[in-house]
UniProtKB/Swiss-Prot annotation:
Superkingdom of origin organism: Bacteria
Record protein name field: Aspartyl/glutamyl-tRNA(Asn/Gln) amidotransferase subunit B
Any GO BP: glutaminyl-tRNAGln biosynthesis via transamidation
Organism: Orientia tsutsugamushi (strain Boryong)
Disulphides: none
Length: 486
């Protein structure tokens, strides 16, 4: 647990998150309009999305299946009866004057997600509910001094709102929770999790309290769209509330916005209660009634999720806990890894992905899907390393060329005339020349200056342009130094 340092004592964070995940579907929740991201404004809008009189909602069954799959993936209980309600409020990007949501009877309740806390211990974050609702349109206020612009392309896209219990005790835990939930959504293929495209957004409820005391007054930080912003917003807001309480004030229950440039939260409006929205069942939509056979069928099709994959990597492949967690955290990385190890050593593969390949990808800011290196070519490189056909130094050079060109390692080695010297006789002759040229250093080595061994290795590498087999160099050099006549 991370504490907030006040002037006189420590305070605890109490955090609950509401995650809004866009359901991965070609059509919207109640209309057949496209959900493709990046289209020109208001080009993917049907009559219902603009709330034209007489237009009626028709439920997209696929979105319901996606929500069931997600609920099962987070260990939630599926409700066989769920009902859509109207959430009434006015805003310019909500043309109907209400949002179709699920308040009284959500599609799923309960569930949990396990994360690692600051000490590396497993912590279970309880889920309160998962419900289906419409997304709103998007308002833009910075393109004109006199007008705001409305884009309804997003209006009506299916959302899953996943509400956690206030079990999160620090901004770091909040970040881990979102990363884990996003990974699960991507494995399930129910949401792409792209926060930069608005497919995953977060509202954070936060209060502070002294250890073992009653819960404080919570504030809600709205529309956080990156993990970095979530952490910064929670850190600032926690400290703000502590400062108010320690100065004798009271925290006002309100909705806040986070300014990422200033790193501060600002009041948006007083926080509403459920009664303010005047929820009532939508008269245009029948209840969702689910058969157990449908739920069982969806459950049987669930893929292996991150926690199960980590367990398999550790127990069967014998990866370290850390390597297993990093590889399993990203669905695409995991798929790449598993394709490579069909023909290559898994532990060596994991080490090279996490160190060398990640280093190149991070430098260029690309994902594994944008990387030119194929799984087959990477496997070929790992096989060359494990068979000692090339040294690690040569392999790093080849990998960089693979990364830049997309060519196979063997083609690169042919084009660059890269070939490891692995002939013991050839290496022995080179070592003889090095020792003769550095007679005085050999004398010093034999008199106890063991550190000179690295100097001799460097001289051999220099003569071979780094292409000699390092293990053979070490083995033969040890023998030659013992036998050298002084």
């Amino acid at each position: 647990m991370t504490f907030i340092e006040g002037k006189t004592e420590k305070w605890e964070y109490v955090i609950g998150l509401e995650i809004h995940a866009q359901i991965k579907s070609n059509a919207k929740l109640f209309s057949s309009a496209s959900t493709e991201f990046g289209s020109s404004p208001n080009s993917q809008v049907e009559l219902l999305d603009a709330a034209m009189p007489g237009s009626l909602p028709v439920l997209n069954e696929f979105c319901v299946h996606q929500a069931i799959k997600t609920a099962l993936g987070i260990n939630a209980k599926i409700n066989k009866l769920s009902i859509f309600d109207r959430k009434n409020y006015f805003y310019a990007d909500l043309p109907a004057g209400y949002q179709i949501s699920q308040f009284y009877h959500p599609i799923a309740q309960g569930g949990w997600i396990e994360i690692l806390d600051e000490n590396g211990n497993i912590k279970c974050i309880q889920i309160n509910r998962l419900h289906i609702e419409q997304d709103t349109g998007k308002s833009t206020h910075d393109q004109s001094d006199t007008y705001s612009y409305i884009d309804l392309n997003r209006s009506g896209i299916a959302l899953m709102e996943i509400v956690s219990e206030p079990d999160i005790s620090s901004p770091m835990q909040a970040a881990e929770y979102i990363k884990k939930l996003r990974a699960i959504l991507r494995y399930l293929d129910s949401c792409n999790g792209d926060m930069e495209k608005g497919a995953l957004r977060c509202d954070a409820n936060i209060s502070v309290r002294k250890p073992n005391s009653e819960l404080g007054t919570k504030c809600e930080i709205k529309n956080l769209n990156s993990i970095k912003s979530i952490v910064r917003a929670l850190e600032f807001e926690g400290q703000r509330q502590v400062n108010i309480l320690e100065s004798g004030g009271t925290v006002k229950q309100e909705s806040l916005l986070f300014d990422a440039t200033l790193g501060k939260t600002f009041p948006m409006r007083s926080k509403e209660n459920a009664t303010d929205y005047r929820y009532f069942p939508d008269p245009d939509l029948p209840p969702i009634i689910l058969d157990q056979s449908l739920i069982d069928n969806i459950a049987s099709s669930l893929p292996e999720l991150p926690d199960a994959k980590i367990t398999r990597y550790v127990n069967e492949i014998k990866l370290s806990d850390y390597n297993a967690q990093v590889l399993a955290a990203d669905k695409d990385i995991s798929c790449f890894f598993e394709e490579v190890i069909k023909t290559a050593n898994p532990i060596l593969t994991a080490n090279w992905i996490l160190s060398e390949l990640f280093g190149l990808m991070n430098k260029d800011g690309i994902t594994i899907n944008e990387c030119k290196i194929t799984a087959n070519h990477f496997s070929e490189l790992i096989q060359l390393i494990s068979s000692k056909a090339i040294s690690s130094k040569i392999a790093k050079t080849v990998l960089k060329e693979m990364f830049d060109s997309g060519k196979s390692p063997k083609i690169i080695m042919q084009e660059k005339n890269i070939q490891q010297i692995s002939d013991p006789n050839q290496i022995a002759d080179i070592i003889d020349d090095v020792l003769k040229d550095n007679y005085q250093s050999v004398v010093s080595y034999r008199n106890g200056k063991d550190r000179l061994f690295g100097f001799f290795v460097g001289q051999v590498m220099k003569k071979t342009a780094g292409n000699a087999n390092p293990e053979l160099i070490n083995e033969i050099l040890h023998t030659k130094l013992k036998q050298f006549q002084i």
